[in-house]
Regions:
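Nucleotide-sugar donor-binding catalytic core of glycosyltransferases
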Residues: 1-249, 259, 267-277, 308-309, ...
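Conserved phosphoryl-transfer motifs of two-component systems
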Residues: 263
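Short glycine/serine-rich donor-binding loops of glycosyltransferases
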Residues: 252-253
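Acidic, glycine-centered active-site loop in nucleotide-sugar glycosyltransferases
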Residues: 276-284
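Generic, well-ordered alpha-helical scaffold segments in large soluble proteins
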Residues: 237, 299-302, 318
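A short, well-ordered alpha-helix in the C-terminal region of glycosyltransferases
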Residues: 309-322
Length: 347
């Protein structure tokens, strides 16, 4: 049991979309399964954990950083662990020894107290496709799918650069608050990698290129059709190509996992969830930017047929566990009770 303290005055309907995800489960959804592992306290003194109630970017946007730092410093003075949550593609890092929950970032710049969260998803088999999970047998040639924004036009490169300059100018004048990241032309680089795979005669590809996010859909019917196309592509291919988006993480990675497929992940200095407590190499194919084709093909050649099928089953089970907010925070509870625990025992 973890006893935690938070400022409950922030847990109001208006803050529903910016609340710390664990607190959303407890205080908004009244999740009794979570309460068996986390118990709220009325004072810092009786707690062993202090949670900042809202996304910390909120305090910067509302110019209430002073409250944020005072709240954190009071907890640290009393030798309490502190959890903070930062949303957005980039997130923000505080100069305090706190545990930061975020969706992505750069492995080379993150400390041991940075906890990368997965994307929390509904099961696409139930909510989108109305299908059951099926294993795809291994074939001689690897087959990989992708549906998404990828554009090789030079105008796209320059447009992304202008967006990047504008975003960083807003950070400079403190109109926006987030960590800095170097320029990375996402659509342009995705297109380049996908084309290299398409041109390789030893790889079978099933790619659908979008010039805009979700193909620029405007109506709910178009959105529904676009969503079905996206998940059908993952369903039909044993491998899914996963590359970072606006932030240094891939939602598609978790979507492939929860569907029981094998993500081929371009390692752009990423950190995956539970990186200290589980071996991601048994769940995905991590490839380098410079040698991704050979690394992918070598994995497929060396992968035994039974292991290939077992990997899909285990990924499905893993995705259902970690992409669910309730079960994710139960796993986090186990880690904070025993930092050296091996999470494989829970899957």
């Amino acid at each position: 049991m973890i006893n935690y303290y938070t400022d409950k005055s922030f847990l109001i309907p208006e803050n529903r979309k910016r609340v710390f995800p664990l607190l959303f489960q407890i205080h908004y959804l009244k999740n009794e399964n979570i309460v068996a592992f986390y118990q709220v306290q009325n004072s810092i003194e009786t707690a062993n954990l202090v949670i900042v109630p809202l996304d910390i970017i909120y305090f910067f946007n509302t110019k209430t950083q002073k409250w944020l730092y005072n709240f954190i410093d009071e907890a640290l003075k009393k030798d309490k662990k502190v959890w903070v949550y930062t949303s957005d593609d980039l997130g923000i890092t505080l100069n305090r020894p706190v545990y930061t929950f975020r969706f992505g970032g750069f492995e080379s710049k993150m400390n041991d107290k940075t906890i990368v969260m997965p994307s929390f998803l509904e099961d696409p088999y139930i909510h989108v496709l109305n299908k059951k999970f099926e294993i795809i047998p291994k074939l001689l040639m690897p087959k990989i799918g992708f549906v998404g924004q990828a554009n090789g036009a030079l105008i796209t490169y320059f447009r992304e650069f202008l967006i990047y300059l504008n975003y960083n100018f807003k950070i400079l004048i403190k109109k926006h608050h987030s960590d800095y990241q170097p320029f990375y032309p996402i659509g342009f680089r995705r297109f380049s990698k996908l084309k290299k795979m398409e041109n390789d005669t030893e790889i079978e590809t099933d790619f659908i290129y979008r010039k805009k996010y979700r193909d620029g859909v405007k109506t709910s019917l178009q959105r529904q059709k676009s969503t079905v196309t996206f998940f059908e592509n993952i369903f039909n291919n044993p491998y899914t190509f996963c590359m970072r988006g606006g932030g240094n993480f891939s939602v598609r990675f978790y979507e492939a996992l929860i569907m029981g497929r094998i993500p081929v992940v371009l390692n752009t200095d990423i950190r995956l969830p539970f990186y200290k407590n589980m071996d991601w190499n048994i769940h995905c194919v991590l490839v380098s930017e410079n040698n991704f084709l050979d690394e992918f093909k070598n994995f497929h050649k060396q992968c035994a047929d039974l292991y290939f099928e077992k990997m899909q089953v285990e990924n499905r089970n893993l995705g259902l566990k970690i992409c669910n907010s309730e079960s994710y925070f139960i796993l986090i509870h186990h880690i904070f009770e025993d930092f050296n625990c091996n999470l494989n025992q829970f899957f």
